[in-house]
Amino acid sequence: MTTVPVTDIQNDLITEFSEDNYPSNKNYEITLRQMSILTHVNNVVDREHNAAVVSSPEEISSQLNEDLFPDDDSPATIIERVQQPHTTIIDDTPPPTFRRELLISEQRQQREKRFNITVSKNAEAIMESRSMITSMPTQTPSLGVVYDKDKRIQMLEDEVVNLRNQQSNTKSSNNLDNFTRILFGKTPYKSTEVNKRIAIVNYANLNGSPLSVEDLDVCSEDEIDRIYKTIKQYHESRKRKIIVTNVIIIVINIIEQALLKLGFDEIKGLSTDITSEIIDVEIGDDCDAVASKLGIGNSPVLNIVLFILKIFVKRIKII
């Protein structure tokens, strides 16, 4: 295939001619369309040249007179000079035209899959592109030179971080607005929904769990309701266990004072060794079961009375 050298062009620009696409290198192959155009131009030039060398009308008329009307001394007759008719074969196939050649070349290009492999200047990347027809030349930088996988990944990561920061800022402002509205009672119809979230976060913070309101945004309302219901049940169960635990501590203090009164000095300090945490670990579930069987509910008044009585029993000798 004939190659046409062109001037040196920078590798970071894709060189394209109108209505055709070429590989971005220095040598360009002549396509079938260009070959058909050149053939048509050559045929037109040949026809013009042949038309220019045809004899003038005077020469043609004199030649006809000489052939049809010979001199008197010529032995030939007119009939002998008349040319015999030539038999021609008519071909129905239309002669090749420029438009037909273009259609044939386009169909051939559509059937063939042409791939042009472009090697970048630094031989770092190989780009495989399919030739396509474009109506406008472009100056887009070559992918083989500009495309950097690591750089694009870093840019995408930075963009994700920026989007997360924007989203977190928006959510924090919304949470602040919700908190102020609840605080001043401006949106009572939403107070219950947001109070559940705040109660969940407060319960998590009391137990040393790093949870924020933003973390609950991924949960649906049904999930928030189930979490809040579970926490409420656990809280009521814990209150019942605290009531039974306070009763046990008061009884242990009274028994300790009675044994000390009877002379058992070794029992001294028993009430200080038994704390609410130990009771909760050892017999916490049993305390909850006992409270449930006795029908002891979450009574704030009873819990406060038992708490005060526990403090006084530890300090005052009843017996």
From Swiss-Prot:
Induction record: Expressed in the late phase of the viral replicative cycle.
Coiled coil: 146-173
TM ranges: none
PTM per Swiss-Prot/TrEMBL: Phosphorylated by a OPG054-independent mechanism.
Entry annotated with the keyword Phosphoprotein: yes
Protein localization: Host cytoplasm
Record GO cellular component, one term: host cell cytoplasm
Alphabetized InterPro entries for the sequence: Poxvirus_A11
Source domain of life: Viruses
Role, per record: Required for viral crescent formation early during virus morphogenesis.
Assembly, per entry: Homomultimer. Interacts with OPG160.
Name the record gives this protein: Protein OPG137
Organism expressing this protein natively: Variola virus (isolate Human/India/Ind3/1967)
